[in-house]
């Protein structure tokens, strides 16, 4: 910075020091103006967008390596300049000293001698009353009143009872229950514990992105979280563009000299061909290319800026070779988990990318936080930063956090933000309210909240803008109104099944019987010795090979050597299992590691091969180290089941009545088979053809029902030139058997799914293989529309619901149907004209974690339709009804 500028800024400090002692009323205003000028000079050439002085001061102090004590002094000065209260005489000289220190840091010059003698040599005396005595304490609530929580410490080695003053967290009062677990974070210990943060049921991890999604212009009510989970799976032009931009960021960072954006476009389209073809507002390939290229151009400039040295800064540049994309983290301390868009492995940089519109940037209007980021994006970034701080013991100033808006070029496209603690605490409070709500639903039933699940409740701020009234409100009404117009049996069914799903989710997250049922919380609660004894962890792994499954993509196939795991080790893993892969030094600790999420491809006694969900293009990331593999968890299945139940309630009345046994299935006995197939099966095949709504085929395993009866049903159905068939089952093994039958019969089919859970013999039938290396939208759509037989697991179909917006199937055949729980099928069956279930009601039902007493129901409305236990399949319920009516 030129000397003249430094001189001018110091002269402003001198002018402030020359103010008359009685000019108290102008101190704040004058100090604020001088501070604004200093900050402007410091950030004007950074190429980044800043909002209020808080974020500017924060950035300048960190980039100029200002010490922690001086940084605190400068921020105190900033707060004083913003205050409506006149700056006190005792504070004034210290504030001027802080301003001079900031000028010195920004201009890289020494404070002139003309000022040295007029300013304090040291900062203001520290307030010693605010030291933190306990960083973390896990405890259990024994009692509480309006001011204090009485807790029993768990795991601090003392077993002591503490009294916690929670007056700063009064919103917790209606949430607290005896026996509830809490994490107390950053406690000040005096007469009582005063925690900085209180985390309710911390083993129940919530996804950060889902918490952030609840922050809207109309409020952030915890019931918005429930509404979001009931909403149809989103597939839009903006989402597709965002997925492309995320892939482009990865490619740009890792191919600085030979990047070709068309490679990214082709790869992204091939991987998401189904989403592109079923997107309802896709504007066409030409328009998408223009928008995608604009995102790429902006990203190239932003990435260059992000990793370039800053001549005006003492900050070391961020290292491109330490950049990592899409790493996962679990944080038991805060009860959250998430996947970060971009960070460096030294934790110095954290970036969240957004590709959509930001009206604050477009209009140049700062938000209520004095900056340009959207609130939900801000919440997401703050929670990620808090997660890193808790997991890795980072200081608050260790990590620089940025929001990358790839729709906009610099400076608007890269927003430096500060760690605004008020909003962070608000986000944690919402997390606590959501968790308490989920526990209440699991305990009291979904019916306990359904009356409050309305647009009026979710619109906390009673917003009535035109945008809300014309766009948001109709969406909420379409989603929620059917919940309040259900018939009595529909209401009983929906609430009972939704409660069942929520209880399964609770068991999957925290366990229903410690030491017996598996749960996500085993990652940090289960001792290492127990993990080994139960076969729930591989340790001491070393990488023996890395492969790229997709050309210029990342290394996503990782082979690891498995050393001796102990004499009695029996792995509780199998191919297809979802896992975390992470490095460690001494003891495996998933909460203190960067996690790579993936699935097991192959395993033997001495080796294991995993496929990473997000391949790493940076060769330095998966380096020589010692690795562990553990089971990972996800809310996807439970969210899909809730969404499936919602689809049922939104289905046409005739369909709801059929699936809930409120109308009889019909048949057309005039239909005849087109040809004889086998004396053993012809009578059954004729009944299948004559059925209009559904047919149940009962047969024990090994009777040839899949290889013969299913084949004949498919062949007969395909005689109708307008027929379209969907063949499905719960397991990939069963779907592989279906594919084998179709292949042997010479029947063409299309398989939807993941190649690493598909038998290699049938991978050529996968959609991304069929569309080739240079896919075209029209050809992909034609492939989907012309495929008369589509094969997939029920889990895959639940995650690919946009398929049903493109086409409707005339017949679905569901194999091993007695192993599939009702919530997993109901949504699927609303998109099918007719279905055939093949199964055996005598087989054991699907594995359920909650106690049998909780899954049973005695509601007469449900027992009347033969629903007595939610752990039984739809196949069994319908079979029992047909038996009772004598129709078998």
Question: What is the predicted role of each segment?
Answer:
Residues 248-325:
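A non-catalytic, helix-rich entry segment at domain boundaries
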Residues 212, 221-224, 409-410, 418-437, ...:
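Pre-ATPase regulatory/linker segments immediately N-terminal to the P-loop/RecA-like helicase/translocase core
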Residues 137, 144-172, 182-184, 508-658:
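Conserved ASCE P-loop ATPase motor domains encompassing nucleic-acid-directed helicases/translocases
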Residues 1-112:
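Amphipathic alpha-helical interface elements
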Residues 719-723, 729-731, 744-746, 781, ...:
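Conserved helicase motor core of SF1/SF2 NTP-dependent helicases
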Residues 118-151, 242-246, 419-575:
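A helicase ATPase "motif cassette" and its flanking acidic/Ser/Thr-rich regulatory loops
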Residues 153-177, 318-432:
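Mg2+/Mn2+-dependent nuclease catalytic core
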Residues 706-720, 737, 741:
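Walker A/P-loop NTP-binding motif
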